[in-house]
Amino acid sequence: MSCVAELVFFSGTMDCGKSTLALQMDHNHGARGRVGLIFTKMDRAGTNVLSSRLGLSTGALEVGDDLDFWDAIVGRATAGTRIDYLICDEAQFYTSDQVEQLARIVDEMDVDVFAFGITADFRTELFPGSKRLIELADRVQVLQVEALCWCGRRATTNARVMDGVMVVEGEQVVVGDTQPGTTGLVEYEVLCRRHYMRRMTSHAAKAAALSPEVLPFDLDVCPLPPLPITQAD
């Protein structure tokens, strides 16, 4: 473990294990006698909780837009609370000012900050928090657990889906269900770039496969065999 505190941003799409890694890192550091605080914002399981899709969860401090990380951590340290590291989940939702406060905590208080978040929104535009983390972090680590598109390719984008139809307009932050097929709700689905650009969700792919008016496969994935060349007499 480095003797110099770092600001590290662990990034990836949905389903790549960010929150699971956050929980594991807290466990590992705690097992070595280090003391930390866990922060999160708008976790799908509710407020004041950090949860993963594997069913693991733990209590956390909820981050509001008005939270000043610097004041909060300095206040605890002044009161005698030992703090060696911070776990900051759903960091894409933090404000740019809050990310700058986290960087200051690393530099001036020698406290490690491990931030976890999605890089880009459903429009493939950077979240403000993620953008500032990329700009300021000592290290940016793309998680190696690959989320998969419905076609089996590596997923690189987060699509917003309403009633099976992918949308590319609307508020940047809308918390929704993450299990495809929940009608009447906003949901999210990870897609490869090709199917994001085509707006081809798993729901749309199934509909296309059942339609007699379209070929039931992707010609780019399963190209038709070339026509035989006939010799002139």
Q: Model features per residue range: what roles?
A:
Residues 7-9, 35-37, 84-87, 112-114:
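Residue-level preference for the first positions of well-ordered beta-strands
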Residues 137:
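Short basic (Lys/Arg) and small-residue
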Residues 106-129:
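Sensor-1/coupling segment of RecA-like P-loop NTPase cores
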Residues 2-77, 121-132, 145, 173-178, ...:
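Conserved P-loop
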Residues 28, 104-105:
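Alpha-helical scaffold elements within enzyme catalytic domains, especially in hydrolases
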Residues 89-91, 117:
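Walker B catalytic acidic pair
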Residues 91-102, 122-127:
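Conserved ATPase-coupling elements of RecA-like P-loop NTPase cores
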Residues 145-181:
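Short recognition patches in nucleic-acid-associated and regulatory proteins
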